[in-house]
């Protein structure tokens, strides 16, 4: 759900700012990438989208429903620990646990996760295919492009994606040289995207195949088809 909202905000940012007010725009949802870009290329800090990340947007949405709840982010990304502790952005996230860490907890308590019964009430069927695609390299940019084309079918959007911090740095060097004016830049710190994060357990290639299937099962494709699309106005503050 947070990925859906992040998509919409970044799409609107790009349409408003590029190229009228800035030569390019970079995505913001990978904290390791955005921190690196801002530190090594401070002159372009304002060109990285100010959109809140999927983690923060999802947490704020849940807090709206239940202000007293405690929120834990569970995923493959160790850099989310840094993001959740930032004081510049209110994250609403109380705990960040990687897949590797939570598996250690299960093993310590002798919990066999594979044998736990499914609960139909906990099915996640309210996200778009584009939102689910955030976890792989190229997925964020594709979601943003699809949202832009939904709002303005004739809008041309050129995209370049980088995976791994070394390639992300090269991408920013090219942008500095003026090679990517008018582009949407997507950076992913982990080669392959979030599915290959430092705290993951599964083989990234297998995860990518499973994600493709998961996207195909989504009840909608475009982020703008989602019922929560109008939630951004009150979640950003």
Regions found by a protein language model. Give the residues of each.
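Iron-sulfur-associated redox domains of electron-transfer enzymes in respiratory
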Residues: 1-237
